[in-house]
């Protein structure tokens, strides 16, 4: 029997996100989220979850001027709501479209939300936009197209050593990531961001595909920005 809502011209509900995957099957080193996302993008491409060139994937660095980034539903939290105040965090967003419907996914190996999680749910539950207004805790998002990120990002992990050269957090067991041009460390270029970096939506939707460091957007325009990207 036909659904009267659809037959009458009403818009059917969007399809649900794909069933959750086992996050433990992906490489994850605590406190090295930038490297986790680098390897995650590669694995999503290799496994066919993304398109072969990774053109529907985006690495997203979350930080602000004060390096105080509130997020919820984080596994590292000791509170019931999963609250953590990071200096920065990195996630992967996959742009998906079906019949004009925006069905974006968020891949966050450090989140207790479904893996992957629908973009709408992640924004609502983990980011909670407008929670802090114009305070120092408002989040900024540096969005880098995955093909550019995989070529350009590098980290020698020096940010995880104290002044005596001791590890603050143990590093991954694999070799550090070196950019295609031989750069060995540019992490700070990705996590440093300010409101002055935020430009108009139209130009950012174009620049994200060519800029080595992507584009910086604020939390109020985050959903609209991704709605403008192709799937």
From Swiss-Prot:
Q: What class of enzyme is it?
A: hydrolase
- Gene Ontology BP annotations: defense response to bacterium; positive regulation of camalexin biosynthetic process
Question: What catalytic activity is recorded?
Answer: N-terminal L-glutaminyl-[protein] + H2O = N-terminal L-glutamyl-[protein] + NH4(+)
State where composition is biased (Pro residues): 11-21
Is Hydrolase set as a keyword in this record?
A: yes
**Keyword list, A-Z:** Hydrolase
Active site residues of this protein: 33, 89, 108
State any single GO MF term.
protein-N-terminal glutamine amidohydrolase activity
Q: Which InterPro entries match?
A: N_Gln_amidohydro_ab_roll_sf, NTAQ1, Prot_N_Gln_amidohydro_ab_roll
Q: Which Pfam families match?
A: Nt_Gln_amidase
Under which EC number(s) is this enzyme classified?
A: 3.5.1.122
Where are the annotated segments for Disordered?
Answer: 1-21
> Listed GO cellular component terms?
cytosol; nucleus
> What are the TM regions of this chain, as residue ranges?
none
The entry's function note states:
Mediates the side-chain deamidation of N-terminal glutamine residues to glutamate, an important step in N-end rule pathway of protein degradation. Conversion of the resulting N-terminal glutamine to glutamate renders the protein susceptible to arginylation, polyubiquitination and degradation as specified by the N-end rule. Does not act on substrates with internal or C-terminal glutamine and does not act on non-glutamine residues in any position.
The record's similarity note reads: Belongs to the NTAQ1 family.
> Could you describe the subunit structure of this protein?
Monomer.
The name on file for this protein is: Protein N-terminal glutamine amidohydrolase
